[in-house]
Amino acid sequence: MLDFNWGIHLIDLMKSTFNIGGDLPVFRLGYGAMRLCGQPGNFGPYPEWEAGKRLLLKAVELGVNFIDTAHPYGPGYNEEIIADALAPYTGGVVVATKGGVEKTAQDRVFADGKPESLRRFCDASLKRLRLQQIDLYQLHKPDPEVPFAESVGALSQLRDAGKIRHVGLSNVGLEQIREAEGIVPVCSVQNRYNFEERGDDPVVDYCEANGIAYLPWGPLAAKPFAPGAPLADNSDASRLAAVGRRIGATAGQVALAWLLARSPSIIVIPGTTCPKHLEENIKAASLKLSSEDLAELNVVG
């Protein structure tokens, strides 16, 4: 069993927020907008544009005030549909986006962390999102061809220029986080982490200890815990299903509730294009996992 402090499960998570950068309070169950693009490959505009706008409005109506997107989603169209639906972002809605990855075709995606590229990406995102300042701008992925400090330094300069409020990182390790902190305050980290894949535990713990938001991407591991997906025949799925049966929830809802209980710094950002699944995901924030539930879920293997 993993030795974590799970006391957070006693809190009503619908009322649980995290202050990104100390001054951006967001509900800890957000929305990852990536799927509101053309498919396959998240390339091109979302074909059901008006339905996508309604889904975003529904998310905000249900209490979501943190939306995550990125330049290469579309590319650009994802940011445009968010602005079309939600600008001018009343009621404390926070939109986080990313730069540092370019997409020129469905199967042509590459890191581009050159300072001049990051400035260009940021300016384009500001225009598409109809913003004067981006609340949280994240380096999407370190570019192996560019010194990491140069990429982070470009974000620091954008912050100094007032174009971004807070800086975040994505797809990084502890050493890179510490290196970035020597250049600019790091307010969020977005890495792959979910009930099945817990290899980023040291980063989760570091973020909690240092007041950094942790945004796990792939929170439902794509399968087998996504809403409507058949449960795989494995121990992870069976444990989630067993807890779900006891508390009247789906395996996917339990997986999201587990993440929220894992650390008070975690903000989960599940994505969906289905209104029913959106509601199902958001309801996960009100689940109460007992100490017995968590003990069962935390057995590895």
What are these regions (language model features)?
Residues 2-93:
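N-terminal binding-site loop/beta-alpha segment at the start of enzyme catalytic domains
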Residues 12, 17, 142-301:
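Beta/alpha (TIM)-barrel catalytic core signal, keyed to glycine-rich beta->alpha loops juxtaposed to Asp/Glu
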Residues 21, 83-91, 127-130, 181-182, ...:
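Acidic (Asp/Glu)-rich catalytic clusters
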Residues 25-29, 63-65, 90-93, 131-135, ...:
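Short, well-ordered coil/turn segments that N-cap beta-strands
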Residues 31, 69, 97, 136-139, ...:
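Conserved beta-strand positions
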Residues 37-42, 102-108, 223-227, 277-280:
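A short acidic, helix-capping loop that chelates divalent metal ions and anchors anionic groups
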Residues 45-59, 113-128, 175:
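Short, acidic/polar
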Residues 117-138, 158-161:
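CE4/NodB-like, metal-dependent polysaccharide N-deacetylase domain
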